[in-house]
Amino acid sequence: MTIESSAKNILFLHRFAVLFVLLFCVLLIPPYFEGSLLMERVWHVLFTFVLLWALYTVAGSRKVLLLAALMLIPTISSTWLAGPEQARYLAYIDNATNILYFGLICFFLASYIFTTKRVTQEVIFAAMCFYILLAVLWAAIYTNLELFYGNAFLFQGELAAAAGIEADDLFQHMIYYSFVTLSTLGYGDVIPDHLAAQNWAAMEAMIGQFYIAIVMARLVSIYTVEKEEEASLATPPD
């Protein structure tokens, strides 16, 4: 086995861990450089890496890989074309492609988690990536709702002055709101005002509860069974 092939195997075996790190970079780095044109480009580069690496994570399934590859080109294109100085319809397209692409990735992650027989480090990272991507997917939905209706959400305090000016800034605010809703924290600084926004927010809150009740419960049950089997094998026969 060559060094190159060995490195590829290591990357593939830790593909969900790498995706998790990239997602955290996309979420946590941009707010510290708000308003910077350079940071806007850096964010687009990081987000493109997330899109590309998300494709790499589904390489184990040919059908999903083919669909994701077909969707990747319009998703990356819309990411770079949509901007504060561009037409609003490009922001709609950008969010729509993100919804479809991340929806497919979430489908693969859910299938991977529910078909696994052992709880490994990568399975845990896959579960965390699944959770984060659900929030990003819903953030794109919320952004399109606000762009379409104009007043789908009510913003309190300083957010009221900042939100809704540019599609990119709006998406960042909606990522925050999406995580707050998915985790059912509900700070109250962003309030869904339109019926469509309320329904989508309620759906996300329910999915957040289902995630804990179903996904996490399954992983815990598999892990418990593994430990019981290991204990039974380690116990010497009478």
Predicted regions located by residue number:
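Outer-pore turret/helix-boundary of cation channels
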Residues: 33-35, 137-176
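N-terminal membrane topogenic signal
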Residues: 3-20, 60
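Short, hydrophobic transmembrane alpha-helix segments
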Residues: 28-40, 54-62, 84-85
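Pore domain of cation channels
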Residues: 168-230
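Pore-domain transmembrane helices of cation channels
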Residues: 106-151
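Structural signature of hydrophobic alpha-helical transmembrane segments
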Residues: 32-47, 91-103, 174-175
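Cytoplasmic-side transmembrane-helix entry/capping segments in multi-pass membrane proteins
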Residues: 62-73, 91-98, 119-129
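Alpha-helical transmembrane segments
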Residues: 12-27, 68-74
